[in-house]
């Protein structure tokens, strides 16, 4: 078999492949064995028609398409390897010659990976992130943890305040007419949660138990129910009950409840500070890496084929569908609720998809330029890390993945990202007051 590659404009080229006649004849034999099983010819049992009779009655041409289907996949794969091209989409194939006793010749218009012209990726100026944990940040984390232990207590006297949870009855109307979904009794609403129409929760502040009030709000212009969008509505609202969060005081007992390794408040604070400091350092490093990746990508010039963007969009839509499925929705239901269709969703995602492709091509090109590879030791370390993280054995991970190619590529790219950050020039950011 022979193959030639002729580069055309942009990211396309013409692959011309010639398969020798002896392989064509073998493919025709295979095609005949398949087709003859489906043929009925008077005087012969089904599947027992001799080849000469078949060709006399139907012509050898009746076998050509099946022979092409047999020859093409392997021939195309071998041609790709022989010419060392990297297709990014299915080719457009045109058969030039298929005939018994002659070579099989076909041409394939192929879109390949684009040329990547790297810009500066070393010595990038990136902002140094703050890693020191402040006392305020520690206290905020303590308050957050204590908040999970808070109990809801009925407010016997007093008025609704931000952060309270109120139990209300309400009935909404537009132009004096009630609308679907605008009525409820015994509804619990946390003030300040932002879960109601803008302006509704704020108007409940200052109300007392058993007090009634007309709450007037305007639906957002982009409201999902088109018949209500932009319209003013009045909600007759009654407060049935007011509850507030009673947060426990941090004691040695509570400290141990929050952290089994801490027996005192001081030990709890020390352990928490250590964990938070480690997390802040990790987060800071990740932010620095992201900035380095973005700048290296921005400095790179690539003419990205539309096919690569579409492939990435397919992946992103699939990821999105999986995420909303975890919330009990499917894509069609989401489209009905949001008023979008898949075309609009893909258009909304297109810029991100293009950036993802460009970033991946940039990092891969840097790996090649710097001759960065993932060693067996690197892969073993990553497998051990995953084993601890997900609490499953290394063998189970290998069996699930089938091979370690994905891990190998991930480790390789992570090495590139480390190189970008390690070779960056850090500048101090402007601290906010």
From Swiss-Prot:
GO terms for MF: peptidyl-prolyl cis-trans isomerase activity; protein folding chaperone; ribosome binding
List where in the cell it is found: Cytoplasm
One GO CC annotation: cytoplasm
The record's Gene Ontology biological-process terms are:
'de novo' cotranslational protein folding; cell division; chaperone-mediated protein folding; protein transport; protein unfolding
Keyword presence, Repeat? no
The enzyme's E.C. designation: 5.2.1.8
Q: Which reaction does it catalyse?
A: [protein]-peptidylproline (omega=180) = [protein]-peptidylproline (omega=0)
Q: Which SUPFAM superfamilies match?
A: FKBP-like, Triger factor/SurA peptide-binding domain-like, Trigger factor ribosome-binding domain
What InterPro entries does the annotation carry?
PPIase_dom_sf, PPIase_FKBP_dom, Trig_fac, Trigger_fac_C, Trigger_fac_C_sf, Trigger_fac_ribosome-bd_bac, Trigger_fac_ribosome-bd_sf, Trigger_fact/SurA_dom_sf
The main enzyme category here is isomerase
What keywords were assigned to this record?
Cell cycle, Cell division, Chaperone, Cytoplasm, Isomerase, Rotamase
A Pfam family matched in the record: Trigger_C
Q: What is its main location?
A: cytoplasm
Q: Where is the PPIase FKBP-type domain?
A: 163-248
Which PROSITE patterns does the record associate with it? FKBP_PPIASE
Fetch the PANTHER family from UniProt.
TRIGGER FACTOR CHAPERONE AND PEPTIDYL-PROLYL CIS/TRANS ISOMERASE, TRIGGER FACTOR-LIKE PROTEIN TIG, CHLOROPLASTIC
Explain the purpose of this protein: Involved in protein export. Acts as a chaperone by maintaining the newly synthesized protein in an open conformation. Functions as a peptidyl-prolyl cis-trans isomerase.
Q: Give the family from UniProt.
A: Belongs to the FKBP-type PPIase family. Tig subfamily.
* Comment on protein domains: Consists of 3 domains; the N-terminus binds the ribosome, the middle domain has PPIase activity, while the C-terminus has intrinsic chaperone activity on its own.
| Name of this chain's protein | Trigger factor
Species whose genome carries this gene: Staphylococcus aureus (strain Newman)
Q: Which gene encodes it?
A: tig
